[in-house]
Amino acid sequence: MESFQKQIMPAKDKFLKKQSNLFLLVIIFFIILFSTNTIAEQVDSKVINYIKNLNFFSSKFIQSNGTSLEEGNMYIKDAKIRLDYLSPDRTLLISKKKGVYINHELKEQSFFSTEKNIVRLFYDIFLDYSFFSSFVFKENNKEIVFEKKIIIDSKITNLKIFFENKPLLLRKIIAKTENELISISFSEHNYNNTFDENLFSFVPMYLD
């Protein structure tokens, strides 16, 4: 009987050790999962607060398609975004459902729906508070990079959005499709502008 018990005890100890190790692994897994979710929630909250403070925002931008560069100024107010390109002189005005392209040199304008147009990304990035919640992101001391594949008008677009970290600043957007790559960089951020009432009108004064 004593010999049998001596055989049982090591087996029991091994079993308990395995159970203890398994329990420890489960605890570590949930700690990592909780920490990851907490970090993600903190980043989401930080970005959402940043987006909410863009109602009187302006910045300079440089847009590139790989072969040419364009410069201009961007303005945001009351759920509308205005992009003024310097050369040629033209404006892109965007709201949630519609947009207008204005050629100031020719004094022409053309309206379009933003729902299936890549320019809708401007609205989503700058004015949709929940847009970033479904993104995968990487964070370090210098930057936060959000990345996601989205479908616009049946085309897959790889979207990357770069924020400077500490302080949080939107620095660059890269949208890549099968045949095109567009990058837009932002500088000279201003959050406390006073805008003229007509700046966000879909009809320029000379066409009214």
Which residue ranges define each predicted feature?
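Sec-dependent signal peptide recognition
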Residues: N21-F29
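Cleaved targeting-peptide boundary
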Residues: I39-K46
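Gly/Pro-enriched, hydrophobic low-complexity segments
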Residues: S130-D208
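Flexible, surface-exposed loop/linker segments and immediately adjacent secondary-structure boundaries
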Residues: K107-E143
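An acidic-aromatic
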Residues: N73-R120, I182
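A short, Trp-centered hydrophobic/proline-enriched beta-strand micro-motif
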Residues: N49-L69
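N-terminal signal peptide c-region/cleavage motif recognized by signal peptidases
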Residues: S35-T36
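N-terminal secretory signal peptides that target proteins for export/translocation
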Residues: M1-K18
